[in-house]
Amino acid sequence: MTTTIQQRSGASSWQSFCEWVTSTNNRLYVGWFGVLMIPTLLAATICFVIAFVAAPPVDIDGIREPVAGSLMYGNNIISGAVVPSSNAIGLHFYPIWEAASLDEWLYNGGPFQLVVFHFLIGIYAYMGREWELSYRLGMRPWICVAYSAPVAAASAVFLVYPFGQGSFSDAMPLGISGTFNYMLVFQAEHNILMHPFHMLGVAGVFGGSLFSAMHGSLVTSSLVRETTESESQNYGYKFGQEEETYNIVAAHGYFGRLIFQYASFNNSRSLHFFLAAWPVVGIWFTALGVSTMAFNLNGFNFNQSILDGQGRVLNTWADVLNRAGLGMEVMHERNAHNFPLDLAAAESTPVALQAPAIG
């Protein structure tokens, strides 16, 4: 009899746990994806904070020239970063137990892999949790589809790009200046600014910001008046009220006269679909562009200069971009025996544009 009671108690505890995990009445929904998300994001956050503050220098290039990224080694909030794992490790999975000692693991940049892998699993689980909560509430699943855009971008810079380049040392450092360094080197090696998918991403981000600002300002400027002319319109509303607070017909009429009639939406669902789809599709394309450039399918280049009848170079903006890219690439490649191939294999290139003779 005692054994039977214990089994029922165990089953009841598990059932209670399942109900708590999947309950939509909790202040914060957990969900089964949340069971995976919470520990992975906690592990990534804790390791990131400790590494950002106190990690020793990392031999990122694999040439015994460690690069310091933590605050305790002289960096500040702007210059600090969790430095990517060493080029000597390459694409090998490098958990703590693969190193001979903790010092070796830190020297080869093991914390970077720990943070990135747990972070990626965490954001994948967060996306699944968005779908799970939508499913429990009977909603449509497009929230997690929209979130897939930044997830794809993070996957591109932290996972796909290192795979394509052959080493996690080429991944984006986890810091402010490290992000800028990654962007400069990416431009130097892949000419990302001349890649059409990056252009679509820029249009998506800036266009999305513009449309969001236009929509928000238009809605808050076309309130349905519930007060007299002598009172503020704001007094006619309560936060979270069920009644509609603005008139989309009035907003449509205003915007149609400001631009032209068919530039404005008269259907709220179409409008909000557009507001969601524009930046999401743009960021999808950027992630796709980074993922293709990871395997050196680069942006357009203008390596052939324009020449006049005597064979002299007519310097154009393309030449300026090329020289800037070569300069960034030289600064990046601190390793003498890993000199940029487009410099080492070609004829010498003048560093500056030709200046006219003075006097």
UniProtKB/Swiss-Prot annotation:
Keywords: Calcium, Chlorophyll, Chromophore, Electron transport, Herbicide resistance, Iron, Magnesium, Manganese, Membrane, Metal-binding, Oxidoreductase, Photosynthesis, Photosystem II, Thylakoid, Transmembrane, Transmembrane helix, Transport. One of its GO terms (cellular component) is plasma membrane-derived thylakoid membrane. The D1/D2 heterodimer binds P680, chlorophylls that are the primary electron donor of PSII, and subsequent electron acceptors. It shares a non-heme iron and each subunit binds pheophytin, quinone, additional chlorophylls, carotenoids and lipids. D1 provides most of the ligands for the Mn4-Ca-O5 cluster of the oxygen-evolving complex (OEC). There is also a Cl(-1) ion associated with D1 and D2, which is required for oxygen evolution. The PSII complex binds additional chlorophylls, carotenoids and specific lipids. GO terms for molecular function: chlorophyll binding; electron transporter, transferring electrons within the cyclic electron transport pathway of photosynthesis activity; iron ion binding; oxidoreductase activity, acting on diphenols and related substances as donors, oxygen as acceptor; oxygen evolving activity. The chain crosses the membrane at residues 29-46, 118-133, 142-156, 197-218, 274-288. Chlorophyll a ChlzD1 binds at H118. It is found in: Cellular thylakoid membrane. Fe cation binds at H215, H272. The keyword Phosphoprotein does not apply. HAMAP family: PSII_PsbA_D1 (MF_01379). Photosystem II (PSII) is a light-driven water:plastoquinone oxidoreductase that uses light energy to abstract electrons from H(2)O, generating O(2) and a proton gradient subsequently used for ATP formation. It consists of a core antenna complex that captures photons, and an electron transfer chain that converts photonic excitation into a charge separation. The D1/D2 (PsbA/PsbD) reaction center heterodimer binds P680, the primary electron donor of PSII as well as several subsequent electron acceptors. Cyanobacteria usually contain more than 2 copies of the psbA gene. 2 of the reaction center chlorophylls (ChlD1 and ChlD2) are entirely coordinated by water. PSII is composed of 1 copy each of membrane proteins PsbA, PsbB, PsbC, PsbD, PsbE, PsbF, PsbH, PsbI, PsbJ, PsbK, PsbL, PsbM, PsbT, PsbX, PsbY, PsbZ, Psb30/Ycf12, peripheral proteins PsbO, CyanoQ (PsbQ), PsbU, PsbV and a large number of cofactors. It forms dimeric complexes. This is Photosystem II protein D1 2. The gene is psbA2.
